[in-house]
Amino acid sequence: MSRAKRKIEHIQHALSTADQGASGFDDITFVHQSLPDVRMNDIHLHTALGELSLSSPFFINAMTGGGGKQTFEINKGLAEAAKHCRIAMAVGSQTSALRDNKQRGTFEIVRKVNKNGIIFANIGSEATVDDAKRAVDMIEADGLQIHLNVVQELVMPEGDRDFTGVLLRIEQIVQAVQVPVIVKEVGFGMSKETASRLEEVGVKIIDVGGLGGTNFARIENKRRSNIITYFNDWGIPTAASIVEVAQTSPSLVVIGSGGVRTALDAAKAIALGASAVGMAGPLLRTLVEQGVEALVASIEELHHDLTLIMGALGAKTIDKLQRVPLVIRGDTHHWLTERGFDTKVYSCR
């Protein structure tokens, strides 16, 4: 099967496959503050990912590209919304365009629409330094995502089976490209062990891509004749993954993604240690079903709601939101305790 056809199948299955709701955000409860001592007009949403300054912690995470007209139109619509709302955007894997010049336009449209926006290029862990540079140049990217998707590849009928040398390639890319590198998972979460190894080779930004959002094991299983059921619920829930990375490697910048559906989810992700939050599935569904205007309205509502939540917590900035007290309970508390983390760090600060 061609990469272009596979991209279309991924979009179709992503739209028809519901998020599994296992992100762990329901286990997080904020400690209410009756004297927040803030003026709502003083609250702002600016944040930073390393050297990149963002006007909002929300960004459109990697989804698609390389599937002809349909993915061209999706990326065009996403870019229009990102431009209007002044938020960053990542494109989907550019491997298809690196192999087939005819697919370049499905990615280049993002920069054409949003000439001054912050845009992230995207490659797989099998990519070379040359691939990385070409992907960045293709869309004049401000940052580069390298996605880790071992489980997806294992379930994918035509997926890769050689995962050696990945860390070395990442190290070489980090040293060679002139933009910040973000290493991300695609729905299975990042462990403290993985975060430490990535930090050792110079990675400074990690997108945990946790369990709870778009499930690529389920998507790939829909393309199989013999289903591999044991990978359908595989992974680290997003809430736990954020803590694993943030608490193990405090110098790393963390992005929370995977099952972020609401401003409350986003606030919880930030309070656990994320500096930004990526959203994909809910935004894709809104765009495809209702159009660009509805997507813009949805993003603006997220901004409005996050501001209200920050007001209730007395947090004027994203930095202050990262330090508000919260209580972790349920499965997330159990996971973190078993993994050696003290959740009182969050409840008593």
UniProtKB/Swiss-Prot annotation:
Localization per record: Cytoplasm
Sorted UniProt keywords: Cytoplasm, Flavoprotein, FMN, Isomerase, Isoprene biosynthesis, Magnesium, Metal-binding, NADP
SUPFAM superfamilies the record matches: FMN-linked oxidoreductases
CDD domains (alphabetical): IDI-2_FMN (cd02811)
Domain of life: Bacteria
Any one Gene Ontology cellular component term annotated for this protein: cytoplasm
Gene3D superfamilies in the record: Aldolase class I (3.20.20.70)
Record GO terms (molecular function): FMN binding; isopentenyl-diphosphate delta-isomerase activity; magnesium ion binding; NADPH binding; oxidoreductase activity
Binding site for Mg(2+): E153
Pfam families in the cross-refs: FMN_dh
Family matches, as NCBIfam families: IPP_isom_2
Annotated PANTHER family: ISOPENTENYL-DIPHOSPHATE DELTA-ISOMERASE
Protein name: Isopentenyl-diphosphate delta-isomerase
The gene coding this protein: fni
